[in-house]
């Protein structure tokens, strides 16, 4: 066997060149058991809580339970291809999602992957899904209105930018319809309003049917509202970890706008299903159950999510994130565990009732039980001026209506109150997909509280309102513009508005 010097020197050179090169160390663990979307992993000693880990075949998971001898991992995807003895790799990254304007108009899953078939997302940066909420110093009190376009809400239960207003009610009471109308109502501002007033929308669908989400997206698309909206969908067929994560992912996407001096609205539809998904994960991870078998930290789950909605101060760019969480009750039971939790976290609630819905009062808002704890600071002055009296009148009407059932001979004052109340209730009805601008609402409610409806039969109120709006949009356009610009009803403007309504009332028959 002949030894060539050149070959030996080549081998030596190669070994010298690679001397001291570190091998890439990736920390791995082994699957001990897997089932129900949960894997128990041995190893991964230095894994962080909430860190992404990778299973064979590219399936991802998140380390949630860090125990003495193993790690409990929830799996984002099907667990049927994972088996005992499989290798699990750390990624070193806490769960994050893409953020930025590139997401507008898209439908994504809880990890920010597109699911609408429109190609990859053009996002520039990624942010962690679970970050700390802003403290007390960065915040500012809520003072700008977030218009929903619904008279019953904007007049009586006003929502401000940076507020958290709960939408609560039984199934099929129109909770999603309120969210949808609020999103559609932002179209006019996006089309011709100033940049600083635009409101970007994020809609998080948790545990809903795919057909429902597809229908929701279709309506947004047809009405031109998808271009300023992001849809995060974790449907009923998605694993529980995805349903648990979706609200946090959506919140991170909304925070991008808040932190860059813009305004965003996020709705979680609905948080009851997120709590159920979290309960499922917690029980499978063998965490101790509490009331209604929910884990002890289910309050913290929702509070840390909803506290991220905030109005930031001037130094941080004046941005805001408004949250409209949805909770579904069973048989109008607001005193169950999750509803009471979320009511205590939010700044008010819009309470929807089945009876009202079937009576044809839609949106089915129970004005007596609904509150906004931010209140009139989230209204323009003009709306305060006209809506101040309507709340009192409706409260008196409800009280009197209860008594009126017992007695037939009512004095004239009571009769007047009942007449006015029934007409105001009629006035607050509104069909779906017809949100009104604030100045139009002011004109309509002004007519209601100043007695223009008192002589009309109740079934003519809707017709009168429709006619009045058409008249104001044509002949009274300058009055509406003045209300929008001045944001208050001066004596002069009040007289002009009165004159326009008088002119219309004469022609109405």
UniProtKB/Swiss-Prot annotation:
Reactions listed under catalytic activity: ATP + H2O + 4 H(+)(in) = ADP + phosphate + 5 H(+)(out)
Residues annotated for ATP binding in this entry: 169-176
CDD domains to which the protein is assigned, alphabetical: ATP-synt_F1_alpha_C, ATP-synt_F1_alpha_N, F1-ATPase_alpha_CD
Location(s) in or outside the cell: Cell inner membrane
Site positions for Required for activity: 370
Pfam families: ATP-synt_ab, ATP-synt_ab_C, ATP-synt_ab_N
InterPro entries: ATP_synth_asu-like_sf, ATP_synth_asu_C, ATP_synth_asu_C_sf, ATP_synth_F1_a_nt-bd_dom, ATP_synth_F1_asu, ATPase_a/bsu_AS, ATPase_F1/V1/A1_a/bsu_N, ATPase_F1/V1/A1_a/bsu_N_sf
Name of this chain's protein: ATP synthase subunit alpha
Naturally occurring in which organism (per UniProt): Mesorhizobium japonicum (strain LMG 29417 / CECT 9101 / MAFF 303099)
């Amino acid at each position: 066997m002949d030894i060539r010097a050149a070959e030996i020197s080549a081998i030596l050179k190669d070994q010298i060149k690679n001397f001291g090169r570190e091998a890439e160390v990736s920390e791995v663990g082994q699957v001990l058991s897997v089932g129900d979307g949960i894997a128990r992993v041995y190893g991964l000693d230095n894994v962080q809580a909430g860190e992404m880990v990778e299973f064979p075949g590219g399936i991802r998971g998140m380390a949630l339970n860090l125990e003495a001898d193993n790690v409990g991992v929830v799996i984002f995807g099907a667990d049927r291809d994972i088996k005992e003895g499989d290798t699990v790799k750390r990624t070193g990254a806490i769960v994050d999602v893409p953020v930025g304007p590139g997401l507008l108009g898209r439908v994504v899953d809880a990890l920010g992957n597109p699911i609408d078939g429109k190609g990859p997302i053009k996002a520039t940066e990624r942010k962690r899904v679970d970050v700390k909420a802003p403290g007390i110093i960065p915040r500012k009190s809520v003072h700008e209105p977030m218009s929903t376009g619904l008279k019953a809400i904007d007049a009586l239960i006003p929502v401000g930018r940076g507020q958290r207003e709960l939408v609560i009610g039984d199934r099929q009471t129109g909770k999603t319809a309120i969210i949808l109308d609020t999103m559609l109502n932002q179209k006019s501002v996006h089309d011709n309003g100033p940049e600083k007033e635009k409101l970007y929308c994020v809609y998080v669908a948790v545990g809903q049917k795919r057909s429902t989400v597809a229908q929701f997206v279709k309506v947004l698309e047809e009405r031109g509202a998808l271009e300023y909206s992001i849809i995060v969908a974790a449907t009923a067929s998605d694993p529980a970890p995805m349903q648990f994560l979706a609200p946090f992912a959506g919140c991170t996407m909304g925070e991008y706008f808040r932190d860059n001096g813009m305004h965003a609205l996020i709705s979680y539809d609905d948080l009851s299903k997120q709590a159920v998904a979290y309960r499922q994960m917690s029980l499978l991870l063998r965490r101790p159950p509490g009331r209604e078998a929910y884990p002890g930290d289910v309050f913290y789950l929702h509070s840390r999510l909803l506290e991220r909605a905030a109005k930031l101060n001037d130094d941080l760019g004046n941005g805001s994130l408004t949250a409209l969480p949805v909770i579904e009750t069973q048989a109008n039971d607001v005193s169950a565990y999750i509803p009471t939790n979320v009511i205590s976290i939010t700044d008010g609630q819009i309470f929807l009732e089945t009876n009202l819905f079937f009576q044809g009062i839609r949106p089915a808002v129970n004005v007596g039980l609904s509150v906004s704890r931010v209140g009139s600071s989230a209204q323009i002055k003009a709306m305060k001026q006209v809506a101040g009296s309507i709340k009192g009148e409706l409260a008196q009407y409800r009280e009197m209506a209860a008594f009126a059932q017992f007695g037939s001979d009512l004095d004239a004052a009571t009769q007047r109150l009942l007449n006015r109340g029934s007409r105001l209730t009629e006035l607050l009805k509104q069909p779906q997909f017809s949100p009104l601008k604030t100045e139009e609402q002011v004109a309509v409610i002004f007519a209601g509280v100043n007695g223009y409806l008192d002589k009309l039969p109740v079934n003519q109120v809707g017709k009168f309102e429709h006619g009045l709006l058409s008249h104001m949009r044509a002949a009274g356009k300058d009055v509406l513009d003045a209300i929008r610009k001045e944001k208050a009803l001066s004596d002069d403007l009040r007289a002009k508005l009165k004159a326009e309504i008088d002119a219309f009332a004469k022609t109405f028959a």
